[in-house]
C-alpha cells in the first residue's frame, strides 16, 4: 500500500455531555482530532501506511493524542516531542434552534512553536507517494 504522510496539529476536543452548554457542564469528554490527523486515521483505515508528522509535549496529555493515533494504526515515528501545550478546542453541540459552538485554544501549542529543525524531512518523505498538510 501507499505511504501517505500528513503534517499538522492534533488537538484535543473538549465537549460537554449530550446537548449541555459549556456553562451547564461540570465535565467534558476528550476526543483527539484535527484535519490532518483525521486524514491519517482515514487512510490507515483503508490499509495505507499512514504517517503523521507533528510535535506534542512529552507529558501525559500529549500522550493521549499520540495513543489515539496509534490505536488506529497511524505511524507516529515522526512526531517530535517537546513544548508545553496540546492545542485544544471546545465544541458545544447545538440543540433545536441553538447552533453548535466552537472555541479554539491553540496559541503556543507544541506544533505552533515547532522549528523545522525538529523534523528530518528527507527521512520523513522517503518513499512517500502523497503528502497532505
What function would you assign to each model-found segment?
Residues 1-74, 111-117:
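Glycine-rich phosphate/adenosyl-contacting loop at the front of the ribokinase-like
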Amino acid at each position: 500500500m501507499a505511504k501517505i504522510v500528513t503534517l499538522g496539529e492534533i488537538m484535543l476536543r473538549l465537549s460537554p455531555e449530550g446537548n449541555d452548554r459549556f456553562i451547564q457542564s461540570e465535565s467534558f469528554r476528550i476526543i483527539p482530532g484535527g484535519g490532518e490527523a483525521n486524514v491519517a486515521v482515514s487512510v490507515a483505515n483503508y490499509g495505507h501506511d499512514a504517517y503523521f508528522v507533528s510535535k506534542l509535549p512529552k507529558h501525559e496529555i500529549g500522550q493521549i493524542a499520540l495513543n489515539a493515533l496509534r490505536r488506529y494504526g497511524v505511524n507516529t515515528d515522526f512526531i517530535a516531542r517537546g513544548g508545553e501545550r496540546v492545542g485544544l478546542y471546545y465544541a458545544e453541540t447545538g440543540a433545536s434552534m441553538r447552533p453548535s459552538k466552537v472555541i479554539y485554544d491553540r496559541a503556543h501549542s507544541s506544533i505552533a512553536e515547532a522549528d523545522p529543525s525538529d523534523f528530518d524531512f528527507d527521512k520523513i518523505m522517503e518513499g512517500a507517494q502523497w503528502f497532505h498538510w
